[in-house]
């Protein structure tokens, strides 16, 4: 479960951002997310510094941070260098100002992140992930992994059976295990 906080008007002080992300950890969320609207480049720096501080204090707790709008675009590209675990981009049309197009994102990621290993998580159930995934595979030439099929193969049962017999918490652990394994793929 993602403990998500958005401020569409401003960027909080560094200490407050860390406090918000730590609250997600304290409430036993799987991931903490903080998104803000920067007014200056210094606001983006504040966000990235808070991200680094949170990762330094709690390296085992994944966080996602981003500054919205055009001014926040660097946080979407370079947030991983400060400890943000995930970034959001778009394959075709941006759904929000500052979203980075896939080609630009991969070009930057290939230059600044060690290796050439990326996992793209796109959309919610019924949002067209399969269609987008096929397009990303075509654009990038990278392997496509259907996460539901992966879980069903490893669990030797359907997702609905997993939910019915084990519950959501078990399914979420299956997702986490899958991401851990996929993260080690060459």
Q: Where are the model-predicted features located?
A:
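Post-Walker A helix-loop "phosphate-sensing" segment adjacent to the P-loop in P-loop NTPases
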Residues: 138-149, 157
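P-loop (Walker A) phosphate-binding loop of NTP-binding proteins
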Residues: 124
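Walker A/P-loop
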Residues: 130
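ATP-binding Walker
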Residues: 127
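ATP-dependent small-molecule kinase phosphotransfer cores
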Residues: 149-186
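Catalytic alpha/beta core domains of metabolic enzymes, predominantly
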Residues: 1-115
């Amino acid at each position: 479960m993602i403990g998500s906080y958005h401020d569409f008007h401003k960027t909080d002080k560094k200490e407050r951002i860390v406090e918000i992300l730590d609250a997600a950890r304290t409430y036993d969320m799987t991931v903490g997310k903080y998104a803000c609207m920067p007014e200056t480049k210094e606001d983006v720096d504040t966000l990235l510094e808070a991200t680094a501080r949170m990762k330094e204090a709690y390296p085992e707790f994944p966080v996602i941070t981003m500054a919205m709008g055009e001014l926040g675009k660097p946080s979407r590209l370079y947030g991983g260098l400060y400890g943000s675990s995930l970034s959001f981009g778009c394959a075709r049309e941006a759904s929000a100002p500052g979203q980075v197009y896939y080609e630009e994102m991969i070009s930057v990621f290939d230059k600044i992140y060690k290796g050439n290993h990326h996992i793209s998580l796109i959309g919610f159930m019924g949002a067209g992930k399969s269609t987008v995934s096929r397009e990303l595979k075509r654009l990038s030439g990278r392997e496509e992994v259907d996460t539901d099929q992966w879980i069903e193969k490893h669990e030797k049962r359907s997702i609905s059976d997993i939910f019915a017999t084990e519950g959501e918490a078990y399914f979420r652990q299956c997702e986490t295990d899958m991401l851990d394994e996929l993260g080690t793929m060459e």
